[in-house]
């Protein structure tokens, strides 16, 4: 459990719908939660990391597009590195569930040590998520 990453993000609208997306569509697990009249939060086991969904009435969206290799990507975003098998399985599930892609699955850094397949989606509260798999995972931090 040491070195588990934690990220807290705002959820506008229906918190239950967003929890359902992470659990039923992405296959994550629901963790601890707390509901109060004017605030609520829920932890999601995001591939071994703590993603906390905080109910919010405020919009925090300031999205920009930045070029990375050959594709513009949305900033801000967060995501996870998956092994190739899990990535392909999730890619198929997202298509079957008719999840709209912000960026369709594509290969970047082709024929480079950083080669990866990546895709970007949004949760029901418009938080952008990147899902990727690297051909050489050990190259992630320049190893």
Predicted regions and their residues:
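Amphipathic alpha-helical "stalk" segments
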Residues: 5, 39-43, 48, 111-112, ...
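Vicinal oxygen chelate
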Residues: 3-13, 42-45, 64-143
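N-terminal beta-strand motif that seeds the catalytic metal site of vicinal oxygen chelate
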Residues: 1-19, 77-78, 133-143
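A short local loop/turn or secondary-structure capping micro-motif enriched for an aromatic residue
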Residues: 59-63, 137-140
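Core segments of cupin and vicinal oxygen chelate
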Residues: 9-60
